[in-house]
Amino acid sequence: MIPNLAALLALPIGEITVLAVICLIAGLIRGFSGFALSAMVMASGVLIITPVQLIPICWWLEMTASLFMLRDGWQDANRKVAIGLAIGSTLGVPFGLALTMAIAPDLSKLVALGVIIALATLQLSRLKIPFLTTNWGLYGSGWLAGIVTGLASVGGMVVALYVLAQQAPPRQMRASLVLFLFLGSVTTMISLWSFGVMDETAVMRGLVMSFPAGLGVVMGKLLFVPKWEHLYKPFCLTLLIALASTGVIRLLLSA
């Protein structure tokens, strides 16, 4: 069975095991924070397979996590914000995928992660960004998230910056992220198929890795309790910076 799994996923068993552990940890983070699953997988998984191959796998992981968390997301989310972000993201993903095909993958990811570090640092410094409270800020953030999703599958990090900038309860912020990622996953699938990124191997890898990711999500949800809600925003912003910085360092070292 193990050799068959290796052949099915076109990966050695050792790499499959490492990738499964990465997905478990990423799912744990997603279950608590409501985002960062794809970012965690991209930041670590690129040591095993290329970003272009990881993007469709991340789609399956995000969809699995969304199904586990959607009920709470629908009940507690700011639906206007989540839907607006999803609309913008839908328009942005094709641009990002086109850029991915046109420029070097490492360069595209370096640009995306650099933007994340800058914006997250600004928010940790408590600098107000009035633009994010406008309709243009809403749809613009969604569009940028779509582009970054196509570039490096870290669009959820951009949306997290927008949602965390709102003066809303932690539970609502987390739920809005969950709802956006579900809606965004539905529309992103169309672009992935259109660009030929979602092939049979990607589907099988995504389905297999959904099991450890789903287990991680369940464990992470158990950690999101009221007494820790005040830690939510600083934890998420610090997580954004850490993940993005890790990706940048890896890219620079491999250059």
Q: Where on the chain are the PLM-derived regions?
A:
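Small-residue-rich hydrophobic segments that form or flank transmembrane alpha-helices
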Residues: I2, E15-I83, G142, G146, ...
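Cytoplasmic-side transmembrane-helix entry/capping segments in multi-pass membrane proteins
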Residues: N78-S89, K109-L113, T133-W143, Q172-L179, ...
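Membrane helix-loop-helix hairpins that form the core translocation module of multi-pass transporters
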Residues: P51-S125
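Small-residue-rich segments of transmembrane alpha-helices in multi-pass membrane proteins
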Residues: A43-V52, A86-L97, L119, Y139-L151, ...
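Residues within membrane-spanning alpha-helices of integral membrane proteins
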Residues: I16, W59, A112-I116, A120, ...
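Transmembrane helix exit motif
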Residues: I2-N4, S66-D76, L97, V111-W136, ...
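Hydrophobic alpha-helical transmembrane segments in multi-pass integral membrane proteins
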Residues: L54, P105, K109, V148-G155, ...
